[in-house]
Amino acid sequence: MTNIFNAMRVTATVGGKEIVFETGRLANQADGAVWIQCGGTVVLVTACSQATDRDLGFFPLTVEYSEKMYAAGRIPGSFFRREIGRPSERETLVSRLIDRPIRPLFPKGLKDEVQVLANVISSDQNNDSDVLAVTGASTALGLSSIPFDGPVAGARIGRIDGQFVINPTIKEMERSDLNIVLAASRDAVVMVEGEASFVPEAVIVEALEWGHKEIQPLIDAQLKLREMAGKAKREFTAPVEDADLAARVAALATADLDVALRIPEKMARKDARKAVKEKVMEALVADPAYAEDTTPLRAVGDILSALEKRIVRERIVREGRRIDGRDTTTVRPILIEAGILPRAHGSALFARGETKSLVVATLGSSTDEQRMDSLTGDVTKRFMLHYNFAPYCVGEVKPVRVSRREIGHGALAEKALRPILPLGEDFPFTLRVVAETMESNGSSSMAAVCGGCLSLMDAGVPITAPVAGVAMGLIKEGDQYVVLTDILGDEDALGDMDFKIAGTSEGITAVQMDIKVKGLPTDVMARAMQQARDARLHILGEMGKVLEAPRAELSAYAPQHAEVFVNPDIIRIIIGPGGKNIKAITATTGASIDIEDSGRVSIFAPTLEAMEMAREMVQYYDQRADIGKNYTGKVRKVLEIGAIVEILPNLEALVHISQLDTNRVEQASDVARLGEDMVVKVIEINGDRIRASRKAVLLEEQGIEWKPEDTARPSGPREGGRRDGGRDGRRDGGRDGRRDGGRDGGRRDGGRRDGGRDRN
C-alpha cells in the first residue's frame, strides 16, 4: 500500500502486466471512486446513488462510459472542440459491457437510482480501456455504501499462434483469431462478448475456463482495497411478499395460467394472460379484506409473474416441453425469401417462428465509409450493420429512437458477419446492412445475422461462407440444468441464460452470453455449445435451400466499379487546378472517384454507362502518343521554327516549320494560330521529346502515302531560327534542330542553308 495525499493503492499482476487500483485521491465526494490503470491507460470510475420514492417497475441503474480526447493528447473534432452530443458507438457498447455483469448483482427490489460513470482520462493507445472500466465499475461499487454483491472482474482473451493471451495489446490483437471479453466473479463467468475467426466450440469453452483462472488476482485486489478503504454497506431490506395474497392469487390463477402458457402464439398467449390477471383482480377487489385498502393489490402483477415463471420452469424440467410445445432441442419453423425488395441491392426476409426480420444490403463507394473520431485517431469502417427494433414489432407504442439495445444487437450481428466478407482489395465496396425487425418473439438479433448473410448473398457480395446464429437458454432447478435451443422471448425472461452463438459450418464468429445463476459448470456450457452447433447447421441447411451461393452478378441498381492504373506523375493533372478536372468528371458522370498515390484509381458509378464514361475520361489524361498516329490538338505556342501543339492532355509536340504544310512556309504564324485546332501526325518520339507533322496529314488527305523518310529531320533552321527559351516539345535546353555541333550561322543563300543539307 502507498499513501499519497490520503490515497490508498493496491496492485495486481495479470498476464505479466501490473494493474493499479487507487482510491482517495480523486472524486472523494462520490460514494465510491477508483483510479484503475494498466500501462499508460487510466480509467476513473465513480459510483453514486440517490434514494427515490418512485416505483419505476425496474431497477434504475445508469452506466455511462466516456472517452476523453485529452486522454490521448487530441482535441475533439466537433465545432465546439469538446465532447458533446450523443455517445459514440464504442462508448455505448462499452457502457453495455459494464452494465451487463453488474446489474444482476444488486439486490432484488432495490429502487434507488444508481449511476456509474467511467471516464478514460489517459490512453497509451496500447492497453485497451474497456476491460479496465468493467473491473473499475465493480471496484467503485464495492468501495461505496451501495448494496452490491460483487466483486466481478473483466478481461480480454486473445489467441495468438494457438496460445491464449490475457489482455493483449491493441497491436497484438491484430494477430489474434479470438477476441473475447469476459466478466467473472470468484466462482463463475457471468458475461461473455466476443468475436472469432471460425474458432471451434471447444476452443471457446477452453478460453473461458482459462480466462476465469487468470483474472482471480483482480478479484483479490478488489477485496483487499475494499477492506482497506470501503464504506459500510447501508442496510437494505428486500420487499417481503404478502404470503396470504400470494396464496390467494395462486389459487385463483394457477389453472388458468397453466392453460394460457401452453398457447403457442405470442399475442394470443399475451391476451390470455391478461385475461387471467383481470379475472384475479376482479375477484380480489370484491374480497372484503381489500375493500378499504387496495394498496396490497399493486403486488398482484409481480406475484403473477413469479407464478408464470414457476409454471413454465417446472413444466420444462418435468415434461421436457416448452411454451410452444417444442422439446428442448428443436428449432422453430424457418421461412426465407430472397430478393424481396425490387430496387434494393440485396434483400432477404428471414422468419423463425414468430420472429421475422427484413434485412437489406446496400453497396456504396469508398466515400461512403464511416469515419469516426476516436482516441486512436480517425477510424474508418467499410462494413456497417444497423439493427432496428420499432415498437410495432411487439405491438407496442413507444418513442421512436435508436436505443442502446439496438446498437448492441447491431454490433453483435456485425461481428458475426465481418469474418466472411471479402477483402477490400478484392471487393472495394462499402457495405451497409440494415435489419428491420418486423416481428419479435425472441432471438431477433440472430435473425438479423441470418437475414444479413442472405441479403449480402442476394446482393452478389462474394462472402467466404454462409453464417447463421441461434440463441440458447437455460433452466436451472436444483442440480438440474436444461439447455434450450432457439429460445422464445418469454423463455429469455423466465430463464437463467441468454447465450447467442453465430458462425459458419466450420466454427464460431460471434458469441454473447449473460447468465443469471451464480455459476455455470463447464460441461453445461459445452452442451449448450454443441446444441447451438446442431441448430446452426440446421439453419444453414435451410438457408442453402434458398441461396446456395452469392449471386454471380451485382444488382443492376448497385454501383458499378472499375479500377484504372495511371502514371502517378499525372495524378495532379487528373485532379486539375483546384480539383477542376475531377469535379468535371464527377459532375458529368455522377461517379465517385478515389485516387491513391500509387496511381490506382477507383471509380464507382450509378450505371455501367456512367462508369465507362468516367473511365474513359480518366484515361484521357493518361494517354501515350504513338508514332504514325494522328491527333487533333491545340496550338499552344507559335515559334519562328514552328509550332507547339498539345496533342494530348499535358503532352506537347513540336511541329517544325518544314512540317506545317506541303508548300514552303515562310512564317509559322502563316499556318499556325494560337488556340486553334491542328491535326498532326506523330513522326518521332525520343524520350520526352515528340515531333509531329501537319504536312504528313495533308499528304494522306491527297492520297499520297506517308513514309517516315518524307518527314526526315531538316539539317538546320532558317536564318535567325534559334530557340530562345521557348517550349518546343523537347527537353534539350532550347537547342535548335540542327546536327552541326550547335553552329547558328544559317542564313538562306540560293535556296540552300550554309553547311546544311537540302530541304525536303
UniProtKB/Swiss-Prot annotation:
One of its GO terms (molecular function) is polyribonucleotide nucleotidyltransferase activity. The keyword RNA-binding applies. It catalyses: RNA(n+1) + phosphate = RNA(n) + a ribonucleoside 5'-diphosphate. Keywords: Cytoplasm, Magnesium, Metal-binding, Nucleotidyltransferase, RNA-binding, Transferase. It holds the Pfam family KH_1. It is found in: Cytoplasm. Residues 559-618 form the KH domain. One of its GO terms (biological process) is mRNA catabolic process. This is Polyribonucleotide nucleotidyltransferase. The lineage of its organism: Bacteria, Pseudomonadati, Thermodesulfobacteriota, Desulfovibrionia, Desulfovibrionales. The gene is pnp.
